[in-house]
Amino acid sequence: MGRSRRWVVLVLLLIGGCGKGSTTHWIEQLQSPESLRRIEAVHALQERKGEAAQIVPALIEALKDENTHVRRESARALGSFGAEARNAVPALQTALRDREPSVRRAAGIALSRIDPKHGDPSPRAARGK
């Protein structure tokens, strides 16, 4: 195989998820010491709808992050998976009591997207009451 062709194959592998853009890579990035990197990882994982079985547990863990933005974005991402994230319901119910209103709000919305029986989050839940 020629040198140019090897580079094309390598680039295609990277684009196809075998390299830095793989699900495993982004799950590992949820442990980054940099909060912006963790948020970027949440957003990247949110786009991988066909891999919920691997991603949802990682996002549930991210709901415990020290950073408010990571917790909020994790709740939003879980909601985007809909019923595939039903294992996240207990963790999201816990997040309804988060100290930050934006996290509580995101958790309530996520719960309503995962299971409509949870209904729309009440303003009371968003206030943590």
Descriptions of predicted regions:
Residues G19, L36-E51, H69-E84, R104-K117:
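Structural detector for internal amphipathic alpha-helices that build alpha-solenoid repeat scaffolds
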Residues S4-W7, E73, A77, N87, ...:
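Positively charged, low-complexity intrinsically disordered regions
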Residues W7-V11, I27, V42, V56, ...:
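Generic N-terminal initiation segments characterized by hydrophobic and/or small/turn-forming residues
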Residues G19-E28, G50-L63, A83-A95, K117-G128:
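Amphipathic alpha-helical scaffolding segments comprising HEAT/armadillo-like alpha-solenoid repeats
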Residues P33-E34, E66-N67, R99-E100:
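Short inter-helical turns and helix N-cap capping residues of alpha-solenoid HEAT/ARM repeat scaffolds
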Residues M1-G16:
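Sec-dependent bacterial lipoprotein signal peptides
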Residues R5, L30-L36, L63, F81, ...:
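Compositionally biased regions
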